[in-house]
Amino acid sequence: MNIALLGYGRMGQTIEEISKNRDHKIVFKLDDDIENHDLNDFEIDVAIDFSVPKAAFKNITTCFKHAIPVVSGTTGWLDDYAKAREICKKEDSAFIYASNFSLGVNVFFELNQKLAGMMQGLEDYSVDIEEIHHLQKLDSPSGTAITLAQQILEQNSKLKGWQLDEADEDEIPIHAKREENVPGTHTVTYESSIDKIEITHTAKSRQGFALGAVVAAEYLKDKTGIFTMKDVLSDLFKN
């Protein structure tokens, strides 16, 4: 499979390493404005986008207009997500966006959703989310933490939203910390006066995120439509 890397920072370099180990070719690396390049010159099967928030929408939609499917893990641009989906459909392309491509995190999402459903009737428990990342992470809270909060909100009609740090009783507080050399740790805590229930996912390196993105690209090749990591996991578990 021929892969384009949209963004060639640490994550892009890790994706390159894993892609080559899985016998794929990196045929294009973007580290400037995508409009400086003619994507038709490169025989791209799938593009993997880990760029920056201000460039993500243009990178993604430019690929759609060249009939190139896109796997995107860039966070912080989701105000334009609905528009990107519409352009994908219009151009008959394919798209997977995920706040986190780690296969382990996506299992964690499934656990979070199930736990939220179990806890929604237990009014003595309050819930909060903590995320810790490296100092270079630009967005706060993380996209993964927001996804966790959204899953809880879907299961609990008494909660109305989330807030960074301080929150009202009907909101989920998300505590975001930035520390040296932390790839990503997320904890969801339910606490009462009697006990505390926690689920935690701790990333040990970028390898898990990068592997998941490559697996998603393998899934997306030759498809059209909008997909999620649930589709990718279902395909993996089926096999």
Curated annotation (Swiss-Prot):
Compartments, record wording: Cytoplasm
Active-site feature positions: 133, 137
GO biological process: diaminopimelate biosynthetic process; lysine biosynthetic process via diaminopimelate
Positions of (S)-2,3,4,5-tetrahydrodipicolinate binding: 134, 143-144
Broadest EC class assigned to this enzyme: oxidoreductase
Cystines in this chain: none
Binding sites annotated in the UniProt record for NAD(+): 32, 73-75, 98-101
Family recorded in the similarity comment: Belongs to the DapB family.
Function noted in UniProt: Catalyzes the conversion of 4-hydroxy-tetrahydrodipicolinate (HTPA) to tetrahydrodipicolinate.
Listed name of the protein: 4-hydroxy-tetrahydrodipicolinate reductase
Gene of this entry: dapB
